[in-house]
């Protein structure tokens, strides 16, 4: 009688726990309730990234951009709790700054592409999340083509769209993302 093998060989996808790049819209249209929602999301993302041991880089944008390595910020906070100090380029804040003004994705996308291209910063195979209302003017076609190129080569792009519950604006960005989730809110009434 022939012995039956006790195991089967199979193919299983490796779980991807690479870095994350989070692009946060801090334009005037995100003021108020959307700002509070996005601040909460960023705090949850920070905790989740730490639990999953995933590096996380934040780019907040409106007309200008500001980049923050969230994991470095967390490490600095832990060191301060131990009584150790390190010099910081940006002062630590407990909440995200509100920049205000208009919205332009050009600078943010350039910074995002630089992170995705730079092997030394280990964000090459990052997942990208945009937190915005997606009321963003289209950047030049060359940038959109590059966006699509990254997506076609395995970079996953996700969006969280924060809009009023009566929002009827079509989202022109949806074809560039793997998935866009929507959070609807009802504005508070002032009596």
Regions inferred by a protein language model and the residue ranges of each:
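Negatively charged sequence features
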Residues: 1-20
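Von Willebrand factor
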Residues: 15-126, 128-131, 135-139, 160-171
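Conserved ATPase-coupling elements of RecA-like P-loop NTPase cores
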Residues: 33-35, 139-142
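Catalytic-core regions built around general acid/base machinery
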Residues: 45, 145-152
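Loop/turn elements at helix/coil->beta-strand transitions in domains of secreted/extracellular proteins
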Residues: 52-54, 124, 153-157
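Von Willebrand factor A/integrin I-like adhesion domains
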Residues: 76, 82, 167-191
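A short acidic, amphipathic alpha-helical/loop segment
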Residues: 142-146, 172
């Amino acid at each position: 009688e022939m012995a039956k093998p006790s195991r089967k060989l199979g193919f299983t996808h490796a779980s991807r726990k690479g870095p994350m790049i989070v692009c946060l819209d801090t334009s005037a249209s995100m003021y108020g309730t959307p700002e509070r929602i996005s601040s909460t999301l960023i705090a949850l993302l920070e905790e989740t990234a730490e639990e999953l041991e995933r590096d996380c880089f934040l780019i907040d944008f409106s007309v200008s951009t500001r980049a923050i390595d969230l994991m470095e910020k967390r490490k600095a906070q832990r060191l301060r709790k131990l009584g150790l100090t390190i010099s910081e380029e940006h002062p630590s804040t407990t909440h995200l700054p509100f920049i205000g003004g208009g919205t332009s994705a050009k600078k943010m996308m350039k910074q995002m592409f630089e992170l995705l291209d730079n092997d030394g910063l280990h964000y090459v195979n990052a997942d990208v999340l945009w937190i915005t209302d997606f009321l963003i003017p289209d950047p030049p076609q060359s940038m959109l083509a590059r966006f699509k190129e990254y997506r076609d080569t395995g970079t996953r792009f996700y969006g969280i769209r924060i809009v009023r519950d009566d929002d009827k604006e079509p989202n022109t960005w949806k074809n560039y993302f793997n998935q866009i989730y929507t959070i609807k809110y009802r504005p508070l009434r002032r009596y």
